[in-house]
Amino acid sequence: MPPPVLIPDARTLDGLATEVPGAVRSLAAAFWPGALTLIVKAQPTLTWDLGETRGTVALRVPDHPLALALLRRTGPLAVSSANRTGRPAATTAADAAEQLGEAIAVVLDGGPTPGNAPSTIVDATGDRLRVIRLGAIPLAELRAVADVLGPDEPREPAHDEPAAGSAEATGGADAPGDGR
């Protein structure tokens, strides 16, 4: 999964993403600013080194006045959670400074986080929108806005790929090219 990129508002979506489905725009309108991260196809002109993202970008508009003010001045920022691997996310600036120590140069203290539920992450890069992490926004609320698969629901095959378990997918006797 690509690292999250915080943006100041939904207008930034088209500058960083391509092929944005209407359902993604509906989710953004309903839940941004807020705890919704949307994974979309990245603009080919996006040349940031975000690691191996497979041509995607994860976007979120935070619901915090200090973060939004910073983003309006700086533009989009790739971020990470303020914690060490395996430790709970920091909920105060002091927690973040204690966990990250000399690995960070600056800590902005905007007060304690309003809750410790992570953002809900929706992958919009496939044929159907799919929740890949449930978080602060429940699946039912997402589904009130858009057709979204839950994290445990099976993915439907694309129109040009065989269904899982079919003879064609498993190389069974009825599969094309089996030489019989």
In which residue ranges do the predicted regions lie?
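Active-site-adjacent structural elements in enzyme catalytic cores
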Residues: M1-R180
